[in-house]
């Protein structure tokens, strides 16, 4: 789970922990969360969706994601790629991602006052979206092809599944070359402070 806030509006991206664990880790009360955005149906991203709805938190997901969560489908807000969502001064535009599920989404989030923009995408084999004026980029990449190919601990079937449903490091770099990185925040040394990769290594996710 990730929190995006402008100090007035607080968005929760994903709810893949138990409801109790989410409350403990986030440092936010349920009443402080304006909305929860879910990228896709897998439990590590949507586990607490039904409980969030019961607690009064609006949950937004695609119809494909909702179809896999019958207990959330009736109450969830169904969204599509390209639709414009507004929460206070924050604007969210979902975009298509590529995973082994129905209708997965990533999110482009902009603060209308500061004009800061975040592009956020997890569990995707590729990205077709191109955005300008990005301030922050948070993209999950899961493997490097030569390391995956050499591994004798990962079954061939799983290797193929990884290749077809997750982002490879070099493909992420190619995608980044197509983006406008001129506005991405840098530190005093010129390193990209606004660029973050979620990389899975040795079965542990690090960010």
Q: Could you describe each region identified by the protein language model?
A:
Residues 1, 41-45, 92-94:
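Structured catalytic core of nucleotide-sugar glycosyltransferases
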Residues 15-17, 41, 65, 97-100, ...:
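Active-site metal-binding loops of divalent metal-dependent hydrolases
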Residues 131-207:
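Cap/insert and terminal regions of metallo-dependent hydrolase folds
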Residues 18-64:
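Active-site metal-binding motif and surrounding structural segment of the metallo-beta-lactamase
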Residues 57, 72-81, 89-92, 134-139, ...:
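Active-site regions of enzymes building and remodeling cell-envelope glycoconjugates
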Residues 83-144:
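Catalytic core of the metallo-beta-lactamase
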Residues 1-26, 105-123, 136:
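Conserved beta-strand hairpin/beta-sheet module of binuclear metal-dependent hydrolase folds
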Residues 9, 55-58, 179-186:
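A short helix->loop->beta-strand "cap" motif at the edges of active sites that frequently abuts
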């Amino acid at each position: 789970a990730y929190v995006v806030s402008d100090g007035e509006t607080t968005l929760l991206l994903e709810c893949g922990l138990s409801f109790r664990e989410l409350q403990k880790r986030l440092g936010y009360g349920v009443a402080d969360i304006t909305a929860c955005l879910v990228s896709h149906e897998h439990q590590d991203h949507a586990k607490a969706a039904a409980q969030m709805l019961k607690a009064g938190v609006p949950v937004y997901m695609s119809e494909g994601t909702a179809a896999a969560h019958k207990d959330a489908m009736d109450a969830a807000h169904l969204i599509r790629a390209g639709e414009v969502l507004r929460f206070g001064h924050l604007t969210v535009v979902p975009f298509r991602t590529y995973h082994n599920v129905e209708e997965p989404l990533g999110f482009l989030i902009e603060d209308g006052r500061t004009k800061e923009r975040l592009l956020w995408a997890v569990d995707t084999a590729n990205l077709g979206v191109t955005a300008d004026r990005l301030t922050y980029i948070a993209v999950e990449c899961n493997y490097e092809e030569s390391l995956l190919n050499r591994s004798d601990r990962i079954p061939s079937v799983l290797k193929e599944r990884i290749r077809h449903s997750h982002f490879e490091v070099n493909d992420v770099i190619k995608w980044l070359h197509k983006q406008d990185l001129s506005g991405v925040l840098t530190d005093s040394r010129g390193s990209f402070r606004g660029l973050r990769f979620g990389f899975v290594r040795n079965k542990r996710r690090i960010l």
